[in-house]
Amino acid sequence: MNTWQVNSEVVYLLSKITGQDLNPRSIRPLFVFVAAAIAVLRGVMVMDKVVVAEEEARLLETLDVLLDEDDEVYNLTQLTIRGIDREQLFLDPQALLTLSNPLSVSAKLLLVAFGYEMSTADGSIDFREQMYLHSIASRLQVEMPHLQAIEAGFTQDTPPSPEGVEEVRQLLGDDRFEEIDPILVKAAQYMRSKLKM
């Protein structure tokens, strides 16, 4: 799937989060991904009831990877962070499903991978963060071998199946994002390097 269809539910939710009157033609696929990523990342950050400086720094580093020179996306991202915190969207599974609905299988996998990166920001994955990410992955229909490959890439606890690793490498390949947004190509490259793929 090379294009993402932004439906009226996504437009309504993004408008509510940002406080802006958005329309489908003005919403870049990158912004949809960034909004979903912020929701997942903020959820990981608050799941263990302690937000540490390392997690705040990781959020900023992730946004550096995901944002380009587009002032409009940058401004909408700032509004999105405030809106997601205000609405506590990370605790609303239906809202997260609505945001992630337009995303491709590859983008959903990338989203979960950024969640795992956030969960290791303070040195280890808290059990509550891990359960939150498993729940997110399940809702996004991320296949278990793919989830295990990502988790193993950040924890080095259990070796993943070679097939799972190869499938994740393919799903995070540049060709999966080239026609959507060049920033997502860069984000996938970044994540492959983090996962040593």
Q: Across the structure, where does each feature detected by a protein language model lie?
A:
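Small-residue-enriched hydrophobic alpha-helices in membranes
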Residues: 1-43, 50-197
